[in-house]
């Protein structure tokens, strides 16, 4: 009898403990569900090379703890890969121009750099890249300074040459140091195509502060083959942040060299606007890479892009830069209203001029985005 009572007590104790654990799990789930309701979901979209992943990294630097040493070190092979890939692009591009261009002679690599170029092109075509040594850096520097490579670099818009090229080529000695650890600037400029989805949680006024919203920002792949993965993120989004590389009006896609990047961006922007799940979603348009745009517009006319063929320059210098920027901005405004259903006109639409590499600009922009979305929430709650 005593044994039966003992077993019964142990059973009751175990059952009580199990019930307590279940109740605790349910309580935590309820708390997490409530917490989730206060987290605003932001979707970071844009075509490939729009700079959205740089924006994402800036958020980590600005509103979180940044990159620790282990994370910085993890970018070392990425930086070195960018260097090798870029030199291969320029070397192979110069050979192509030397074969096909009327003024072919200026694209012929000098005799002393010919073998170096072939060697570096072979390395750039590998799946695994060697660590950048002082010897390799010296060879890369030699071919980078070759007149033919500089002529080719001047036509970089035709070759998918990345924005980080000049920066990394001017820092080869530092990048090849045996104790090299990437800096935050190196990380911001390092190019890795986003595949799949990455996310980050942050508050523009500090995590967990009562006065500030908490956001979860999702960055998804920008290349065409990545876009089918977006759909499961669409529901419940507070805002779409759509990035446009306004400097790339004269460039073609990485995945389709017959397609102008700006035309692709226009079509993507209009496609996103027409998605039913975004009818009530706020849109924040980041006209990004303004730093590159303001230099390029003085040399490359805006009307080389089919969408901007009606553009007429009015001046030179800073006045022309502003005129060209306002023209592009107006084009996107027109595109927005033409692609927006009449019953969606009450959703918020804002345009911001951005340079993803400029931390002050990004910080100021996200503070403005935060203010806009908080006012929207108050309006929807009937408090404004």
From Swiss-Prot:
InterPro entries: Gprotein_alpha_su (IPR001019), GproteinA_insert (IPR011025), P-loop_NTPase (IPR027417), Plant_Gprotein_alpha (IPR002976). SMART domains: G_alpha (SM00275). The helical domain (69-189) is required for self-activation. Residues 186-194 are annotated as: G2 motif. A lipid is attached at residue 2 (N-myristoyl glycine). Residues 215-224 are annotated as: G3 motif. GO terms for biological process: adenylate cyclase-modulating G protein-coupled receptor signaling pathway. Keywords: GTP-binding, Hydrolase, Lipoprotein, Magnesium, Metal-binding, Myristate, Nucleotide-binding, Palmitate, Transducer. Guanine nucleotide-binding proteins (G proteins) are involved as modulators or transducers in various transmembrane signaling systems. Residues 38-384 form the G-alpha domain. PROSITE patterns: G_ALPHA. GTP binds at residues 49-54, 163, 188, 194, 222, 288-289, 291, 356. Pfam families: G-alpha. Its cofactor is Mg(2+). It comes from Pisum sativum (Garden pea). Mg(2+) binds at residues 53, 194. This is Guanine nucleotide-binding protein alpha-1 subunit. Residues 284-291 are annotated as: G4 motif. GO terms for molecular function: G protein-coupled receptor binding; G-protein beta/gamma-subunit complex binding; GTP binding; GTPase activity; metal ion binding. Belongs to the G-alpha family. Residues 41-54 are annotated as: G1 motif.
């Amino acid at each position: 009898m005593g044994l039966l009572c003992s077993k019964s007590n142990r059973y009751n104790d175990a059952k009580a403990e199990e019930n307590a654990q279940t109740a605790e799990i349910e309580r935590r789930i309820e708390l997490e569900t409530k917490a989730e309701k206060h987290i605003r979901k932001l979707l970071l979209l844009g075509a490939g090379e729009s700079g959205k992943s740089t924006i994402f990294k800036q958020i980590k630097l600005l509103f979180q703890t940044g990159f620790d040493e282990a994370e910085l070190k993890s970018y070392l092979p990425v930086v070195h890969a960018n260097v090798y890939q870029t030199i291969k692009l320029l070397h192979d591009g110069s050979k192509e121009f030397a074969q096909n261009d009327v003024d072919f002679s200026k694209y012929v690599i000098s005799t002393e750099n010919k073998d170096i170029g072939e060697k570096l092109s072979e390395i750039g075509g590998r799946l695994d890249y060697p660590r950048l040594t002082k010897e390799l850096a010296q060879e890369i520097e030699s071919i980078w300074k070759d007149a033919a490579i500089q002529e080719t670099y001047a036509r970089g818009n035709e070759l998918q040459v990345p924005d980080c090229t000049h920066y990394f080529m001017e820092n080869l000695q530092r990048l090849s140091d045996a104790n090299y650890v990437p800096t935050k600037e190196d990380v911001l400029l390092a190019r890795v195509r986003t595949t799949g989805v990455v996310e980050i949680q942050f508050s523009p006024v500090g995590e967990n502060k009562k006065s500030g919203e908490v956001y979860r920002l999702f960055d998804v792949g920008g290349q065409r083959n990545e876009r089918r993965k977006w759909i499961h993120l669409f529901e419940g989004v507070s805002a779409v942040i759509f990035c446009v590389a306004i400097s790339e009006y004269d460039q073609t896609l990485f995945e389709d060299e017959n397609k102008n990047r700006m035309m692709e961006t226009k079509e993507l922007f209009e496609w996103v606007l027409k998605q039913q799940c975004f009818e009530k979603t706020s849109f924040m348009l980041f006209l990004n890479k303004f730093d590159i745009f303001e230099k390029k517009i003085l040399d490359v006319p805006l009307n080389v892009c089919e969408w901007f063929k009606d553009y007429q320059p009015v001046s030179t210098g800073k006045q022309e830069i502003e005129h060209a920027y306002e023209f592009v901005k107006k084009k996107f405004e027109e595109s927005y209203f033409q692609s927006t259903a009449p019953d969606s006109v009450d959703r918020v639409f804002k345009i911001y001029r951005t340079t993803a590499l400029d931390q002050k600009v990004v910080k100021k922009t996200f503070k403005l985005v935060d203010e806009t979305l908080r006012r929207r929430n108050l309006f929807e709650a009937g408090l404004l």
